[in-house]
Amino acid sequence: MFATEARQRYQQELTGIRDAGLFKEERYIHSPQGADIEVEFPAGDPARRVINLCANNYLGLSSHPEVVAAARAGLDSRGYGMSSVRFICGTQDIHRELERRLTSFLGTEDTLLFPSCMDANGGVFEAILTDQDVMIADRLVHASIVDGMRLAKAQQDTFKHSDLAHLEEKLQEHQDKRQRLVITDGVFSMDGDLAKLDEIVALAEKYAGPPRARPPPRSRSRRTR
């Protein structure tokens, strides 16, 4: 009985989504990812060649012959996947070697690999922040950053998109926090505009340092007749 009622309820919801034009149909790709691909859409129609403007394959590396050959060599030598997270069974030595090479190339203290940028954004804030800290993010940051912020215990706040005056107000407002972490995209994925990184860094450095007592609100004087 319950299963029947649940199925009917879900079917009604799906019907409403379709009627509103919001139901997403999958596209079946019959070719490697690239600037143009062979796509079957709608499902059941003959596949046709189309220009692909929506993939994250910006440099075309997913089907580059050298990348494909390296992936094939990795499968032959190490098999498919880790079969666990790295701290259970261990991590592959070739992963650690890649981290070392990236560290040398970037000139950083160390490097940590994640399976995707989504996973990296989901893991970084929780690891470095506590409930004594605050995250101050541009309101148009990527959804993966928003998800990562939700996992952290730190307080969340935002500033208007690329509005440095508003960011400074937020930094002043949160001077009582142990750490004030400013979060922004480098290139904003929806609009394509660039973050004002030099100015953001300058503001972050201006308000860096130990926590300070929050200044009292300004009192408003009243005029008397």
Walk through the language-model features, giving the residues of each.
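Conserved PLP-anchoring active-site segment centered on the Schiff-base-forming lysine
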Residues: V124-A143
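Active-site phosphate-binding strand-loop segment of PLP-dependent enzymes
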Residues: N57, D157, H161-R214
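Conserved N-terminal alpha-helix of the aminotransferase class I/II PLP-enzyme fold
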Residues: V68-S116
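Short, small-residue-enriched loops and turns at beta-alpha junctions
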Residues: L61, I88-Q92, A143, L164-A165, ...
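Buried hydrophobic positions in well-ordered alpha/beta secondary-structure cores of metabolic enzymes
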Residues: G21, L53, L102, A120, ...
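Short, structured coil segments at secondary-structure junctions
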Residues: D131, L151-K153, Y207
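N-terminal "arm"/small-domain region of PLP-dependent enzymes with the aminotransferase-like
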Residues: F2, A6, Y10-R78, G209
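Active-site-proximal loop->helix
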Residues: A127, I145-A152
